Amino acid sequence: MKIFIDVNVFIDVMTKRSGWSGSLRVLNLVRKSRDVESWTSALTMPLLYFFRHRVVDDTTARTDVRAILSRVQLVPMTEAILDQAIAAAGADFEDNIQLASAESISVDHLITRNKKDFAAAKISVLNPEEWLALQEVAALEAKLTPPPGP
């Protein structure tokens, strides 16, 4: 499974804002799972540094961004992605870039705290809790499925 993690999921955890425990569970699960390929936009890293550096020193902000970089793959910022984001109907250019990035690599799900910002998405958009519930159902179904017979 290939997922795209929106910047606000990382910000949830960094700032421990409302809903952060679900976001933390997503990040922990994708870090431990060999079945989940996690991606984010190249735009996410400077945004995370900016938000983090507002509350901690430069070294800590850079260390935190580097830790995230080691756990996710980055969708490169290309002219095609920027063109798609500019042409998109959504009012938030940053969200348009995130969506264009996710769609460019054909992810199964985009995980975000703000689903309403991705109403025009052609891919599945879930909040962290919805994605976690989906994973729990899949795990239960896997346990209930009998092994193939002889």
Residue ranges of each PLM-predicted region?
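Acidic active-site catalytic centers that drive phospho-/nucleotidyl reactions
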Residues: D6, D95, N114
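Amphipathic coiled-coil/heptad-repeat helices and related helical stalk/stem segments
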Residues: S23, E94-D95
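Short, well-structured N-terminal submotif of metal-dependent ribonuclease cores
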Residues: M1-W39, V55-T60, E136-P150
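Short active-site alpha-helical segment characteristic of glycosyltransferases
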Residues: Q98
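A generic structural signal for short hydrophobic patches within well-formed alpha-helices
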Residues: F10, M45, L82, F118, ...
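Acidic catalytic patch
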Residues: A42-T44, D64-A89
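Acidic, PIN/NYN-like endoribonuclease modules and their adjacent C-terminal/linker elements
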Residues: K2, R71, S104-P150
